[in-house]
Each structure stands twice: as C-alpha cells, then as structure tokens.
Amino acid sequence: MIKETFSPEETFAFGKWIGEKALPGQVYTLVGDLGVGKTVFTQGVAEGLGITEPVNSPTFTIIQEYESGRMPFYHFDVYRIGDIEEMEEIGYDDYFYGNGICLIEWANLIEEILPEQIIEITIEKNLEKGFDYRKITVTGLLEQIKWQKN
C-alpha cells in the first residue's frame, strides 16, 4: 500500500488510521531519514490507539511505553543501540511477542532479532513534489490489519 501525504497533518492522519486498525501483537518497523516525519506519523498511530499522553521519539531511552490506550504501545528508537545485547537487557522479546503493538524506528539495525511477521512502513520525501510531500509505503503482512476504505 502506498499513501501520499502533502502536509504533516495528513501524515499524522494516516498514522492515526494505522493505529485504529492495529491489532495486539503486531510489530511495525518504521524507516525514514532524519526529519522525514517519523515522529509525526508515530504520534498519529498513538492517537489511533487512544493514547492520551504526549508521544516523543525515544532516541536516548530506546523505548517509550504507553499504556493509556486500548492496548499497550511500545515505541522503540534503536538508532543509538550499540549491539543486540542492549536489546536483550531491556527484554525486547516481552515487547515483540506481547499483547501490545511495537513500532520500531531504525529497525534495520536489529533485523536479526525481529519477528518473522512484521509490517514495514517507509516514509520518503520528494522535494520536487513539495516541501511537505511524503510517500508512505506499507508492506509486509497486510492481512494482519483490518484494512478498510477511508
């Protein structure tokens, strides 16, 4: 699935739509350059899950846990991870194989420990189409999501 957005609000809204469709136990990987809108998208996912607290990138903490929504939301940013042992120290498997949903930024750095069934989300800019243009590509096991028309 490919979604084009033309403003941060549209990127947020698409994230919210994903969050509304998310099911317990799903693991999403989120790929995109710095400043592409990963945090805005993630904030939308959180709102779609009914999370009421502020959502920010966990760059320095590796994981932020949110429990105020309809299911737990675990937001990982593994950009600064030194090695897989750091993931083991935080008990990643409890999150990846639990009843909440995980969204993992920079997941390519920990590919060897990702579950087999993931949903990959890539956000790309194209300045020729406008400063706020984003191409959001969702691939993987889309049948996990109850996709509906907007």
Could you say what each language-model-derived stretch is?
Residues 28-30:
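Hydrophobic anchor at the beta1->P-loop junction of P-loop NTPases
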